[in-house]
Amino acid sequence: MESQQLHQNPHSLHGSAYASVTSKEVPSNQDPLAVSASNLPEFDRDSTKVNSQEETTPGTSAVPENHHHVSPQPASVPPPQNGQYQQHGMMTPNKAMASNWAHYQQPSMMTCSHYQTSPAYYQPDPHYPLPQYIPPLSTSSPDPIDSQDQHSEVPQAKTKVRNNVLPPHTLTSEENFSTWVKFYIRFLKNSNLGDIIPNDQGEIKRQMTYEEHAYIYNTFQAFAPFHLLPTWVKQILEINYSDILTVLCKSVSKMQTNNQELKDWIALANLEYNGSTSADTFEITVSTIIQRLKENNINVSDRLACQLILKGLSGDFKYLRNQYRTKTNMKLSQLFAEIQLIYDENKIMNLNKPSQYKQHSEYKNVSRTSPNTTNTKVTTRNYHRTNSSKPRAAKAHNIATSSKFSRVNNDHINESTVSSQYLSDDNELSLGQQQKESKPTRTIDSNDELPDHLLIDSGASQTLVRSAHYLHHATPNSEINIVDAQKQDIPINAIGNLHFNFQNGTKTSIKALHTPNIAYDLLSLSELANQNITACFTRNTLERSDGTVLAPIVKHGDFYWLSKKYLIPSHISKLTINNVNKSKSVNKYPYPLIHRMLGHANFRSIQKSLKKNAVTYLKESDIEWSNASTYQCPDCLIGKSTKHRHVKGSRLKYQESYEPFQYLHTDIFGPVHHLPKSAPSYFISFTDEKTRFQWVYPLHDRREESILNVFTSILAFIKNQFNARVLVIQMDRGSEYTNKTLHKFFTNRGITACYTTTADSRAHGVAERLNRTLLNDCRTLLHCSGLPNHLWFSAVEFSTIIRNSLVSPKNDKSARQHAGLAGLDITTILPFGQPVIVNNHNPDSKIHPRGIPGYALHPSRNSYGYIIYLPSLKKTVDTTNYVILQNKQTKLDQFDYDTLTFDDDLNRLTAHNQSFIEQNETEQSYDQNKESDHDYQSEIEINSDPLVNDFSSQSINPLQLDKEPVQKVRAPKEVDADISEYNILPSTIRSRTPHIINKESTEMGGTVESDTTSPRHSSTFTARNQNRPGSTNEMIDLTSQDRVNYGLENIKTTRLGGTEEPYIQRNSDTNIKYRTTNSTPSIDDRSSNSESTTPIISIETKAVCDNTPSIDTDPPEYRSSDHATPNIMPDKSSKNVTADSILDDLPLPDLTHKSPTDTSDVSKDIPHIHSRQTNSSLGGMDDSNVLTTTKSKKRSLEDNETEIEVSRDTWNNKNMRSLEPPRSKKRINLIAAIKGVKSIKPVRTTLRYDEAITYNKDNKEKDRYVEAYHKEISQLLKMNTWDTNKYYDRNDIDPKKVINSMFIFNKKRDGTHKARFVARSDIQHPDTYDSDMQSNTVHHYALMTSLSIALDNDYYITQLDISSAYLYADIKEELYIRPPPHLGLNDKLLRLRKSLYGLKQSGANWYETIKSYLINCCDMQEVRGWSCVFKNSQVTICLFVDDMILFSKDLNANKKIITTLKKQYDTKIINLGEGDNEIQYDILGLEIKYQRSKYMKLGMEKSLTEKLPKLNVPLNPKGKKLRAPGQPGHYIDQDELEINEEKFRNRFFGTKAMRLRDEVSGNNLYVYYIETKKNIADVMTKPLPIKTFKLLTNKWIH
């Protein structure tokens, strides 16, 4: 039945065989002679398995089907016509059909195309199909061909190994012959003919028989068509058609020759050297490989060769890796010289002392100790590379074991599992890994071994023996494994003891390990030391600790040896020892493979997952776990690298030996931004390790001198106060600590500077935690007290005082107690920010208040006083003259302090400080007494001078006193502090003249109606104290008829302490005078007639104003608003007309008017720190000055107006117009300046879409904007700015990634209309861009220098512009834009691809894009130190965003750059710069007229002519141009080009000078500029110093 199936299906079977052969091939680089049946691919093993059945032809079910290939037909292999091989001398059928041939079956049964004319083959029978597999030859011994009598016995003598053999594939081309030969040789080996295949030398193991020869010949013909053979094969076969073995021999030789190059590369990549062989041998080996590669036209550079050699160095040579790691020019000869040097040194040292370790001359650390009774001490010289290095002997297997085995009982071996240990030294070995089979590790040549001796090794921590003959009490090893210096495993078979019997009958025993995989038997000196035995290498003896000689030691070669005759042999079976621990799992998967397959997960995670069956088809028992826990994956070490872990308390063991104040921790915090210059921006903290005492010092900068002064101070303080010397200071690696100045300071004082390691801030935990604690306290104290931020260091110092006095959770004493100081005196401490009243010991007048409100900060460091902050004076004082305020609420007024009143407690705690003492105030030592621009709100006085010349007269209206509406006033904006300095001092505040104001107008600023209301005489006055906490609006009730007569009787006043004075009787007689003034009076026109009359009321009171000079004598332009006299018309029937206030034009926020409050409490006079303070300098009369009868808690009065008049007279007489005017004028000038600035209307340069297109009534302009709009849209689509394939729903996108967009339209300077689609970067989220990226532009110094060089060298200047530059830069972040509203896509988003204009990162992206293109494609290099300046040998480019300025001696070089740019970018040529005539440029707003080799003129006349009139600033057309060559008489030499910053400033007197080149300029370079002195317009166009601002504003008014 089976034979019938074969007859019916011959082609399918044959095709399957071919599919199986061709579907899987052995790699071509595999050694053909090393291929065995066990190494065949899976299909070979499957084929063998299937064909291991009976010899009968298998059925179709037994043939494995290949589902991946279409089975080819047998006809696909074309048979050669007439057998292309030679016909003469062919084997006869009789020879081919010897008796033994029957055993191999018929030749026609092989899977091959038959040869019709070959006499060596029988014609195939059409009834027999070709089988799938070829029957192999037997393994019987060869029979001679002429032994005809034994034909019948041969088949019985042969034993078959395989029934069928997989045939090779058919040769398809001449180029594949070498690959085909590999498969053919494997086919012959599988056919039991491997011993007759010649090697590359042509040698064979035995002669083949005739039938074997015929078998090889026929199969070679079958699978290698003659016409596809290489030429050299054909030449061999033409000589001898049957010489197949010669073909195979030469093929093998050629394959090995072709693989030599690959072998050389592999050998070079796998170089290893540890000193076991001589350095000369190693150098010859490497040089030979490199030379052989060079002969094959492969040059190996010195750098590559050095890197490959360094990778394989180990042992004492390993440190060379670090030495050459940073070198760029590595020489092979130099590296060989270094290796030879180390090898020679080690050899010399080993000859002198066998226990000495090989070392480099630069790393010798000689230690010499004498032996004692407990431990063995051997004179060693150790090469310390790590802190844990140990003494080692040269060339010996250094072995280290766990401490669990040291000093163990000799009669018992601990069999418990030992955890793995990796020691720090490369030459030490560790235990704890499971044993696994490995080849013997013999890194030492054993030819120097002394037979029957033990090598004495000082570096080995365990004794190792190769023979179990001397091992007593041996137990199998189950878990212990040792690795050698090359990290190779040394399996341990057993653990036992060695018993010694020395000369004098002394017996001892040491632990030993048995392993056959070492070169020498090693005797560990550390094991002998445990038995009090010492090796004396000077007398060559083993001695006891008492000096008794136990045995001699012998020096042989480089080592010392102990004879084995002192060992007591055991009777243990060697076979038993070697077989006690066989590996139970041979076919387990290695753990590194599983580790990589499971994504480099950690060991515990993988093991636990397999236990929980989280991974199918893989069990825990299928993996080799022996080295899993200690396996180090290089990829994991690189990819998962982290900082080392800090163990709590690990630092203490290194510092517990220090005494108090010998070990300090220090760190710097800062800077704190947005502070006045007087406040410190940094602080430096110190902490003592032993006592944890803390110091803080303020710093204004981090310069070396500042840090050095602090260190000098604290070292002197500790030395004098605590009689201690600082030994160590720990700090980080900041430049303020690692500079040479501080290093020299530490060295001179013998202080050890202990730095943290790189990027390891946690190692500096003491100082870092202190800074965090102090800053937490600082924020809390400032927030609770409401004090300004510039007092932040006072809060830090207060926190330091408290922290030093409290006990920390980890200590049983406070820092003060540890330091031997007394505890904190609670009576000397006030809550931070406690309101107090400070005695003013130096008032300006005897009648001025003597108390100043303030806030307590912290106890003084330099006295017994307290540091108190005075908001009114804007400084801190050190004083004991203060009184604590009672019931004063702090900032947190929203809390109920009725139940939290601590007044009684504070009185009890500070009872002895409740009185004023002698005058002992001092200024704060670290400049906190200076005024701050951020401490308070400056005040602005109302200008009574007119701002315009035209005004109209109005009738004088009577006062309206019957209403008091609640209205809003406007608080002033913050201005410079120095402007309001006049109002800060207590002696310059209150007016001496009582006045009456309109009740209605008072709410709007205290305006007083007059008959003629002008901006000068009808000025609006603001009540400064309405808006200040603690101030009052309380005035005398003027609504009753009997009080309108200005009699002012029975007015009650209040003293500072809160007690009421008796009622003062006021004089009711008033003298009302009228004064005529000019609207713009001069100093000399006091009596001239004016266009309006102002009623001046002089109210003479006997009690207050008897000594006050007449008000009429004061011209109004010199009258400060603090002394402004109210203009009141006595006619009560006149109507009330309120004049417009100047403050209406100021951009001030509205504040709701507050009703008058009770001011009986003194504490309410303290200005609240966080409120907007105002005073009378805002332009109105102080409410407290109304009739001088309010319940005044204000600042002190002006002494008298006579002083002001005298100062004015002096001013006028000396005519000092160029100096600073009197302070009484500052506020008027400032208001005028602000008024003038307000009059300048801003000019909008851009339009929105609706303004430019939708509602634009100018049709021509609209059409131009529409054209520009479509042009921008086209450019956006052309550049693929966004993803046009998909719209995104805004609900599906993170709002942080969404940015609004808009179209803006403008008109450029050249008249063209421009449209730009931009992103709203003002609402861009910070997470969507990298804040560190910067958009660089060319510095003006670089541009001016390039222009000057171009002028001197006759360069061509070409100006270019790149259209839509930002759109060429890709965007890395995922961002979406919301289309503009006019597109109607309200709920859709677009995904950005390009850097759209307006994005934060667009400028940086474009800069990186164009920079990369200029460097890579245009062969440019960026000039170091000047960003956006690129240069090559011919062209210099200055880049300003999308504008380029090209400078070149040859115009063709510029054109070449332009051509290259046009390939990538849309480049426009603004000005090519060709020609010799004058060429005009407009570069970044700078107008340049340039004529090569003649002149270059720079200016801004055109742009200034267009811009300045828009700012209402007239342009002086008569400006004179000056010719200034720089500093007169000074010339720059070549040697003076490089100067430091200080010399630069001194030489050019602070001018922004250009960097000039003397050899370029030739002393002929002149700069033309317009000299502008201090101009009034500078107030609006420049940031000015305060004095310059005052001066210019004063000029403006006059």
From Swiss-Prot:
Role description: Capsid protein (CA) is the structural component of the virus-like particle (VLP), forming the shell that encapsulates the retrotransposons dimeric RNA genome. The particles are assembled from trimer-clustered units and there are holes in the capsid shells that allow for the diffusion of macromolecules. CA also has nucleocapsid-like chaperone activity, promoting primer tRNA(i)-Met annealing to the multipartite primer-binding site (PBS), dimerization of Ty2 RNA and initiation of reverse transcription.
Assembly, per entry: The capsid protein forms a homotrimer, from which the VLPs are assembled. The protease is a homodimer, whose active site consists of two apposed aspartic acid residues.
Catalytic site positions: D457 (for protease activity)
Domain notes: The C-terminal RNA-binding region of CA is sufficient for all its nucleocapsid-like chaperone activities. Integrase core domain contains the D-x(n)-D-x(35)-E motif, named for the phylogenetically conserved glutamic acid and aspartic acid residues and the invariant 35 amino acid spacing between the second and third acidic residues. Each acidic residue of the D,D(35)E motif is independently essential for the 3'-processing and strand transfer activities of purified integrase protein.
Binding positions (Mg(2+) 1): D667, D732
Species for this entry: Saccharomyces cerevisiae (strain ATCC 204508 / S288c)
Gene Ontology CC: cytoplasm; nucleus
Name of protein: Transposon Ty2-LR2 Gag-Pol polyprotein
GO molecular function, one term: zinc ion binding
Comp. bias (Low complexity): 369-381
Superkingdom field: Eukaryota
Native organism taxonomy: Eukaryota, Fungi, Dikarya, Ascomycota, Saccharomycotina
Ranges where the record places region Integrase-type zinc finger-like: 579-636
